Amino acid sequence: VTATFAKDCCDREVMAWRAWEGKGLPGEPVREMLIEAVERRFGSVEAVPQGQELEFLSDNGGAYIATETRALARALGLKPINTPVCSPQSNGMAESFVNTFKRDYVARMGLSDAQTVLAQLPAAFEHFNEVHPHSSLKMRSSREFRRQQAAGADQALYCE
């Protein structure tokens, strides 16, 4: 199973993800995921609202650096940025998420075949967003943090 995700670096929410049986990372799932992430965060809009500069940080995989992907990111109001070559530590939040997801979710899944894994992923991502605590969010889940931010309850962790 191959997977990719779009994660907010402020509130740690996985806004969109794609997974499929097999290896390789085609560009189309990445582009679909970008559109979904923007729509989930900002509603049915054509792009990120004016006045907000958001970066799309990715590694240097072909699907992410493809002309079509970078053009779509810009059209959505995102600024495409790639990590330095041979420097996975510069994408530390993504690397940390992958390790956490493997440890806390994949290790507890039935792994008998790809379809079994794929069937379990929606619940795992939902649990990560709704329940999984983050030390950087004062041990709140991503969505709990967002709800409290929306209510104005904790401006101490406001992300710009």
Feature-to-residue mapping (PLM):
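Acidic/histidine-rich, metal-coordinating catalytic segments
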Residues: E46-I65, P84-C86, N91, M139-R143
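C-terminal domain-tail junction helix/linker
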Residues: R74-L78, T100-E160
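Short loop/turn microsegments at loop-to-beta-strand junctions
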Residues: V1-T4
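RNase H-like polynucleotidyl transferase catalytic core
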Residues: A19, E55-N60, A75-M93, M109-A114
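Hydrophobic "anchor" residues
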Residues: D11-V14
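Distinct, well-ordered alpha-helical segments
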Residues: L34, T69-R70
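Active-site beta-loop-alpha junctions of metal-dependent nucleic acid enzymes
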Residues: K7, R18-V48
